[in-house]
Amino acid sequence: VVNPSGKIGISLLILKDKQMRYDRQIILPEVGEEGQKKLQEAKVLIVGVGGLGSPIALYLAGAGVGCLGLVDDDLVSVTNLQRQVLYSEKELGKPKAICAAERLSALNSEIEIHPYAARLTKDNAYDIIQEYDIVVDGCDNFATRYLINDICIEQKKPYVYGAICGFEGQVSVFNYGNQKKNYRDLYPDEEEMQRMPPPPKGVMGVTPAIVGSI
């Protein structure tokens, strides 16, 4: 039944459109409508929207995660384009966080996206992280990983860790549910890790795509 204003009819059309957008995952018994609702209510912070962060952000936005935060203080460079699929040549020299937010909004206008064109530091990390349910690490340095880890422990939030080098990658989830293992259990000596020489810069473009998708 549609009232004279047509508002009920419009609401039904909007609801049907949302169901069609996510239909291919809603029909999976492991997801269903309840799972899709959880995705739409979720708030995920992605720290670093480069090689790892690009596929992470694209697929979370496509899946309908309701709120994404994007933290990155870097600018788009030509060397990024080989693997950082969020960006294009016309965005060279522009802030990654802002460009990523625009691209993701074009992909899915139904979700909230909050760009933070700044480095995650001890001064801002606590306030930023407390706005989200889960933190996904797409950064490339040990200091930021330890910072994310410690605040996630303090705020009792899951920390999804990822790293890549060459043809290899690592993925783990820390501080989830009753599982109390964290990043410091994997790498207990922070000072030793900070003294390590930087890893080789070489990486195949598909490596972050595979690791980020996991």
Q: Where do the model's predicted regions map?
A:
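Adenine nucleotide-associated cytosolic modules
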Residues: 12-214
